[in-house]
Amino acid sequence: MSMTPREIVSELDAHIIGQNEAKRAVAIALRNRWRRMQLPEDLRQEITPKNILMIGPTGVGKTEIARRLAKLANAPFIKVEATKFTEVGYVGKEVDSIIRDLADISMKLVRQQAVEKNRMKAQDAAEDRILDVLLPPAKDQWGNVQETGNASTRQVFRKKLREGQLDEREIEIDISTPVNVEIMTPPGMEDMTSQLQSLFEGMSPNKTKKRKMKIKDALKVMLDEEAAKLVNPEELKQKAIEAVEQHGIVFIDEIDKICKKGEHSGGDVSREGVQRDLLPIIEGSTVNTKHGMVKTDHILFICSGAFQVARPSDLLPELQGRLPIRVELKSLTKEDFERILTEPNASLTLQYRELMKTEGVDIEFTQDGISKIAESAFRVNEKTENIGARRLHTVLERLMDGISFDASERAGEKVVIDEKYVSDALNDVVENEDLSRFIL
């Protein structure tokens, strides 16, 4: 990650409206990962990431920031919900599985990078295998391949193959099929299941079987097989573990749902237990994964929650101390809704325009129409539950319902969505609080 904080914020601005404080915090945290890697080894080990706690109501962009960050970081990234985990000893997923899943993601990422690096060699080998099926080499009576003059023919076929002229032709090929072992275990023991599966699959040799498929599909399968032959599994494991330890990012959503609310007890015991189990992972510990031991000392943790019932101070004091950077995301205004409808690269209005274009219907959203949509969504949020920008999806679906249903019969038409159109479609529902609650 060599992008500067300003570049990261600019990239996030293309998809997320407002919330500049949160964008700055994640941009600085991401850049600090790169800065740390430029330091000498002894100093590098002393610098730990400054974990972030994002606080804000639902639908204001917390999860979207995480989603976009994952694409920008090009590093092992996992998003989990705190409510999915239980204290050790209870039935359910343990928090250690977060790091195991992150290691799996890292392995996949490193393998993809290795495949890309060897793509040219793998491409040539895959093409050779296809050409061997199309133009089987001549053999003598002892089974030895004879050198014949078909080199020029192979070149002609290779050119056709690369140009896609043979894509639809069917051939029969041998593909390796790993042995799949299904193991049934009780709930909460998924980690043991995956380890046993890896053990048994490693003991069973891969078999090959013949399959008929189109050349374009066969080329993809063979490309994967040939690329797998060119990578060193042990080297991949080392790189994957290093990527997790030095660049891994964990986003924990709904952290407020595992707070102990007030003086209540009972069901909250397990919630507090999840917080206690999170402590060593965030502070720095070693987790055993199927790829090897992973140290969590330098993994960046970003936690988020609405904190509408609980408060950040309801988290365990030790956990609060491990989340030193606090960022508050603001509730969205009507003006924010207007910007969300038009400014992002894949704005909602653009999505609907392009979808209807496939049916030959031209949709035009006027400025006063967009203002009315934003106002309607904002009013429904005020009257009922405030679900932030997600309300725009429900309002737009309601607005576009008739056009979406009839689009196939209205090819060639132009539909202008202005203030009057929006009022006619939504006013009854927006004004009636009971209808708003159930429909929008």
Swiss-Prot record:
One of its GO terms (biological process) is proteolysis involved in protein catabolic process. GO terms for molecular function: ATP binding; ATP hydrolysis activity; peptidase activity; proteasome-activating activity. Belongs to the ClpX chaperone family. HslU subfamily. Keywords: ATP-binding, Chaperone, Cytoplasm, Nucleotide-binding. Its main location: cytoplasm. ATPase subunit of a proteasome-like degradation complex; this subunit has chaperone activity. The binding of ATP and its subsequent hydrolysis by HslU are essential for unfolding of protein substrates subsequently hydrolyzed by HslV. HslU recognizes the N-terminal part of its protein substrates and unfolds these before they are guided to HslV for hydrolysis. The keyword Chaperone applies. The lineage of its organism: Bacteria, Pseudomonadati, Pseudomonadota, Gammaproteobacteria, Pasteurellales. ATP binds at I17, G59, V60, G61, K62, T63, E64, D253, E318, R390. This is ATP-dependent protease ATPase subunit HslU. A double ring-shaped homohexamer of HslV is capped on each side by a ring-shaped HslU homohexamer. The assembly of the HslU/HslV complex is dependent on binding of ATP. GO terms for cellular component: HslUV protease complex. The keyword Transmembrane does not apply. CDD domains: RecA-like_HslU. It comes from the Bacteria. It is found in: Cytoplasm. InterPro entries: AAA+_ATPase (IPR003593), ATP-dep_Clp_protease_ClpX (IPR050052), ATPase_AAA_core (IPR003959), Clp_ATPase_C (IPR019489), HslU (IPR004491), P-loop_NTPase (IPR027417).
